[in-house]
Swiss-Prot record:
Homooctamer. Dimer of tetramers. One of its GO terms (cellular component) is cytoplasm. One of its GO terms (biological process) is isoprenoid biosynthetic process. Mg(2+) binds at residue 153. It comes from Bacillus cereus (strain ZK / E33L). This is Isopentenyl-diphosphate delta-isomerase.
């Protein structure tokens, strides 16, 4: 019951605290092309995460599950939206269902709604090989997300305090998993050093989960008697984290998430080097406040606007969008300069 109550608290406080939108994309400007030599009708948006083919560079990221009927209903609706738009979808952490079988239905519902969909299972970095296998089997997942959430756990009143051995556990899961493993942050971003460590143990796909979206330090602080306010602005902004990712020069696929709400955010994230983008809090707010049809319509508009932007840039495919010239300025530029990451190749390609 404690875990289920926490799941419901997370939904409530994620909606009430909102998204900070401090993702850094305001520091990214595209170089206008007056002769794009492109046509809206021929733009295609297919992409890949590793060997996993996706019809869209937008997917529904991990949100919930394990909180009884309410979380079952949310996942049911999200799965319907994913089916309607042929989007991939991740579930929230399945540890609740591994600890209490009665909660499994809130995750299994997605496969009932969308039997042929692409779904990602989800567990924390404390998971064992056996738990990872059970989570994948529970929803017949196409991939497994392992989330890193140190700051959330430290801020959570009942959270973990020991983070030793995490990389070694991830390595074991990667070596034994029958599906691709995606390691993700939960809104605090990833540094190039972290990504290099993950690549060294065989991880091939990373969701950078940057600062700028749902702030899980703020969410957990709402549940505390004594707030750890120093964690409320902790992390690496989404745009910065994507560039840190691409600077590793590893053969990794990158997912951009963290405050992404618009087609321009999507286009900038991909142009910086992401293979796809993920939406969570923004979609949840629309679903909870305006209903499922409004969310379906919003995703239609996102795809339309993304194709308009790609047409303007002369990028006929997602791969071409990853090569358009752009200028990095402001705080993002200063951070990257201090970190010794060269940005000139973005503006001169």
């Amino acid at each position: 019951m404690v875990r289920a109550k926490r799941k419901l608290d997370h939904i409530e406080y994620a909606l009430s605290t909102g998204q900070s939108r401090t993702h850094g994309f305001h520091d990214i400007d595209f170089v206008h092309q007056s002769l794009p030599n492109s046509s809206y009708e021929t733009i295609t948006c297919e992409t890949k995460i590793g060997e996993l083919s996706l019809s869209s560079p937008i997917f529904i990221n991990a949100m919930t599950g394990g909180g009884g009927e309410k979380t079952l209903h949310i996942n049911e609706q999200l799965a319907y939206v994913a089916k309607h738009h042929n989007l991939a979808m991740a579930v929230g952490s399945q540890m609740a269902a591994l600890k209490d079988e009665s909660e499994a239905a809130s995750y299994k519902i997605i496969r009932k709604v969308n039997p042929n969909g692409i779904f990602f299972a989800n567990l924390g970095s404390e998971a064992t090989i056996e738990q990872a296998e059970r989570a994948v089997d529970m929803i017949e997942a196409n991939a497994l997300q392992i989330h890193l959430n140190v700051i959330q756990e430290l801020t959570m009143p009942e959270g973990d305090r020991d983070f030793t051995g995490v990389l070694q556990r991830i390595e074991k899961i990667v070596l034994n998993s029958k599906v691709p493993v995606i390691v993700k942050e939960v809104g605090f971003g990833m540094s190039k050093e972290t990504m290099q460590q993950l690549a060294s143990v065989g991880v091939t796909a990373i969701d950078i989960g940057g600062q700028g979206g749902t702030n899980f330090a703020a969410v957990e602080n709402e549940r505390r008697q004594r707030m750890l306010s120093y964690f409320n602005n902790w992390g690496i902004q989404t745009a910065t984290s994507i560039i840190e990712a691409t600077s590793t020069n590893n053969n990794l696929s990158f997912i951009a998430s963290g405050g992404i709400q618009t087609a321009l955010d999507v286009a900038k994230a991909i142009a910086l080097g992401a293979n796809t983008t993920a939406f969570a809090g923004y979609f949840l707010r629309i679903l909870m406040e305006d209903g499922i049809e409004k969310l379906v319509d919003e995703i239609d508009l996102l795809h339309t606007d993304l194709k308009f932007i790609m047409t303007a840039l002369g990028a006929k495919t997602i791969e071409e969008l990853q090569s358009v010239p752009l200028v990095i300025k402001g705080e993002t530029y200063h951070w990257l300069t201090q970190r010794g990451i060269d940005t000139t190749h973005y503006s001169r390609r």
